């Protein structure tokens, strides 16, 4: 029996089908008409969402996004990327939790990479590490036993419909909630442990993929694996084309498997610690860059004949670095464990600059909240906190036992909602980084976005009170000091200013406070 899909606009044939299914009599005709109208209305509303132009850089300010007619920044604290490939993770519950917290972004791995349960990166309850035999890959299982992670080997020539049903449903459920999804197609493998679980490893498939050094997996020197990678990437891109809430990322942390030391954070450390993580700034080598360029072409060529074109993100490096050169067609520049300087050094690129992953600063919420305010008030476009409180069985984000090298909690998500609300209370598209207005802020570091002469978004990082000297034009002003933990107004004042220097006294605060300053009249 053919059931009309709600993922496309219903046809006349669908309408006739529904009437026949209702088997209406003359008496039931009115009831049938009402039910049919409800069906068509619901389906049409869904088709309208799917026909919206995909999220893009805002034409008036490319450091923010245009999404469904509004200028937006993307802020979240999301799960560890395994929502689709782990069938034991209830992503409906997860997305509902994100939506309830007022967050609008999540990152999703496309299924080509999985981790080792209770081992990889010390994550004990890892939704990117399905249990034995539970890895739901894009590829179908064969009839041959022997996959290293349990169950049968994979047949790389066949897709698994269950994966793509789950993938499309995830994108659709996120779309209903206004949540943008970064689909990460590939990832570095870091060491042999993850490579042992790869479906592309010849021991795990029936397709005789070439036996290679795993560090060559994401290079053009990977033998017949390259063709399977292209087919996989194109399939994920094609399946997602109708959705307006998708950004594609080429590869997660491409420098990790093929690093080139480019800079260090603290040059005063002694080798070898000076030159390794967490002090090194590494870039991918030339072999990696050539492969990434090819992968970007797969995305672009696959979408060329399709209705929609989506943004493409390049994961550039950890921490901060002035970008020397981006791959062709890149819209979003992703940094991990980012410093605010990742924005300031690259603002002139006129691309979205993203803090794409947090972690390795302990479990305390304060560290990640402060990172979010510092980054976004420097002109950042995206803040994506990796939240280890989302685990299988706790998809509402309430697993608060230690679980890996990062943080995450309902409290942190509430605090990030304060940041999102603060930014949305301003004319976001008119804001730009401002190094002039705050002349001095005693004992703290100041980050400022402003529409000069109109409104100012100021974040003070540290402990107060602080005396803040501002250079403001003449006018009538309202000033609200916002508690970055609760969103409450800790202090408000209105004042008339004749122009020039103006000193404001903050209230007491710990680990940061925000100031919303608006000029109401000359």
Language model segments and positions:
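Intrinsic, low-complexity polybasic segments
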Residues: 9-10, 14
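Bacterial N-terminal signal peptides
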Residues: 31-41
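Boundary at the C-terminal end of the N-terminal hydrophobic targeting segment
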Residues: 43-47
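Aromatic- and carboxylate-lined catalytic core of secreted/periplasmic carbohydrate-active enzymes
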Residues: 48, 368-494, 501-522
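Active-site mouth of glycoside hydrolases
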Residues: 52, 60-64, 68-330
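Short, hydrophobic beta-strand segments that form beta-sheet elements in well-ordered domains
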Residues: 311-317, 332-336, 353-354, 458-459
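Catalytic-core region of carbohydrate-active enzymes that cleave or remodel glycosidic bonds
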Residues: 325-395
């Amino acid at each position: 029996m053919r059931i009309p899909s709600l993922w496309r606009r219903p046809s006349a044939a669908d309408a006739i089908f529904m009437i026949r299914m209702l088997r209406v009599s003359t008496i039931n005709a009115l009831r049938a008409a009402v039910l049919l109208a409800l069906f068509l209305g619901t389906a049409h509303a869904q088709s309208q969402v799917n026909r919206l132009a995909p999220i893009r850089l805002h034409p008036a300010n490319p450091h923010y996004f245009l999404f469904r007619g509004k200028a937006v920044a993307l802020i979240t604290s999301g799960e560890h990327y395994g929502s689709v490939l782990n069938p034991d993770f209830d992503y409906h519950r997860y997305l509902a939790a994100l939506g309830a917290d007022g967050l609008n972004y999540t990152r999703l791995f496309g299924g080509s990479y999985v981790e080792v349960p209770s081992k990889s990166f010390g994550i004990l309850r890892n939704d990117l590490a399905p249990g034995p035999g539970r890895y739901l890959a894009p590829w179908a299982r064969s009839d041959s036993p022997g996959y290293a992670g349990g169950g049968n080997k994979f047949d790389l020539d066949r897709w698994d419909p269950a994966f793509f049903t789950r993938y499309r449903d995830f994108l659709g459920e996120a779309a209903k909630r206004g949540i943008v999804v970064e689909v990460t197609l590939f990832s570095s493998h870091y060491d042999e442990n993850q490579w042992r679980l790869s479906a592309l490893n010849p021991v795990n498939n029936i397709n005789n993929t070439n036996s290679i050094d795993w560090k060559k997996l994401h290079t053009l020197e990977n033998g017949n694996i390259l063709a399977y990678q292209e087919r996989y990437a194109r399939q994920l891109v094609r399946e997602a084309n109708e959705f307006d809430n998708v950004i594609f990322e080429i590869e997660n942390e491409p420098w990790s498997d093929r690093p080139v030391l480019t800079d260090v954070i603290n040059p005063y450390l002694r080798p070898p610690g000076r030159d390794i993580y967490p002090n090194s700034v590494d870039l991918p080598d030339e072999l990696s860059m050539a492969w990434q360029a090819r992968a970007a072409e797969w995305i672009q060529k696959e979408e060329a004949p399709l209705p929609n074109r989506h943004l493409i993100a390049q994961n550039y490096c950890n921490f901060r670095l002035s970008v020397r050169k981006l791959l062709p067609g890149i819209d979003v520049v992703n940094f991990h464990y980012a410093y605010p300087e990742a924005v300031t050094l690259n603002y002139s690129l006129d691309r979205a600059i993203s803090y794409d992953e947090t972690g390795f600063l302990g479990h305390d919420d304060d560290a990640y909240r402060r990172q979010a305010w510092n980054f976004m008030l420097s002109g950042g476009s995206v803040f994506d906190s990796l939240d280890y409180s989302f685990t299988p069985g706790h998809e509402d984000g309430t697993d608060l036992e230690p679980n890996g090298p990062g943080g995450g909690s309902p409290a942190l998500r509430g605090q990030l909602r304060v940041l999102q609300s603060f930014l949305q209370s301003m004319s976001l598209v008119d804001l730009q980084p401002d190094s002039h207005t705050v002349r001095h802020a005693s004992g703290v570091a100041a980050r400022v976005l402003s529409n000069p002469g109109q409104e100012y978004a100021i974040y003070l990082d540290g402990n107060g009170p602080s005396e803040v000297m501002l250079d403001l034009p003449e006018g009538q002003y309202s000033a609200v000091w916002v508690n970055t933990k609760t969103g409450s107004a800790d202090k408000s004042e209105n004042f008339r200013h004749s122009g020039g220097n103006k000193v404001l006294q903050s209230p007491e605060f710990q680990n940061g406070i925000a100031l919303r300053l608006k000029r109401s009249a000359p």
